[in-house]
């Protein structure tokens, strides 16, 4: 007999990290989604500001796939409280899908391990981006820095050195169907030279984040393929990146499909000066901007305070 009700929270995330398109992501504690699941007469979604039809909602699609695969006969009511800003490149859709997969697994005692939940949450991303990419959902499920394998949809958590700090530059810039559009700009093929450069950068970035090597991370946080293709959407990006580096930051990349930017910095960075100069860039373009300085987060977890209807 399944439990009657439970609630979980799932962290935001930044994907790609420059050269690691659909391969790298990192979970942060800046924002969380909370998802409540309980038995009901049918599958129902309750949420504000996002689609509530199960087949158009990331949590709903995740639930539909799990219901199908495990022959779940009970109805499920899924209530979603969006703590993660939607459409800003912070893994909002993936967080809801991750939370739904984790909650349904626990509600019905399905016995799945965290790594097994990734494929179900990735299915949910179809509702947002049109493709089941597992990078954000892997970070929200496992926490930490994740390396994703598209084959078989699996991921591995890697611990990040405490030498580094993180700044999220969050522009209040909404673009309709942004993730689908941003993914449509990605080239279908690349030259061998670009492939070798990005492979080297991904290796440098992972090794540097693990070991605390500033130079490796700085080298790794660059990309001439996906970010270059998407640059017209975010005309401020290069100026923000250059300003961050001039202020002593380790590096800067577009967070996921943007418009948010992730800056990695350390004790050599003139942080206040950097934030002040970056703010001026956005002010000059008439764009509102906010900043967050998150810690690396653990993955989705159950909480004791269910959402009120």
UniProtKB/Swiss-Prot annotation:
Pathway the protein takes part in: Amino-acid biosynthesis; L-threonine biosynthesis; L-threonine from L-aspartate: step 4/5
Known function: Catalyzes the ATP-dependent phosphorylation of L-homoserine to L-homoserine phosphate.
Membrane spanning residue stretches: none
Enzymatic reactions: L-homoserine + ATP = O-phospho-L-homoserine + ADP + H(+)
EC number: 2.7.1.39
Entry-linked Pfam families: GHMP_kinases_C, GHMP_kinases_N
The species this protein was found in: Thermoplasma volcanium (strain ATCC 51530 / DSM 4299 / JCM 9571 / NBRC 15438 / GSS1)
SUPFAM superfamilies: GHMP Kinase, C-terminal domain, Ribosomal protein S5 domain 2-like
Family matches, as InterPro entries: GHMP_kinase_C_dom (IPR013750), GHMP_kinase_C_sf (IPR036554), GHMP_kinase_N_dom (IPR006204), GHMP_knse_ATP-bd_CS (IPR006203), Homoserine_kinase (IPR000870), Ribosomal_Su5_D2-typ_SF (IPR020568), Ribsml_uS5_D2-typ_fold_subgr (IPR014721)
Residues binding ATP: 85-95
Keywords: Amino-acid biosynthesis, ATP-binding, Cytoplasm, Kinase, Nucleotide-binding, Threonine biosynthesis, Transferase
Primary localisation category: cytoplasm
Enzyme class, broadest EC rank: transferase
Annotated localization: Cytoplasm
GO annotation, cellular component aspect: cytoplasm
GO process terms (BP): threonine biosynthetic process
GO molecular function, one term: ATP binding
Xref: NCBIfam families: PRK01212.1-4, thrB
Record-given protein name: Homoserine kinase
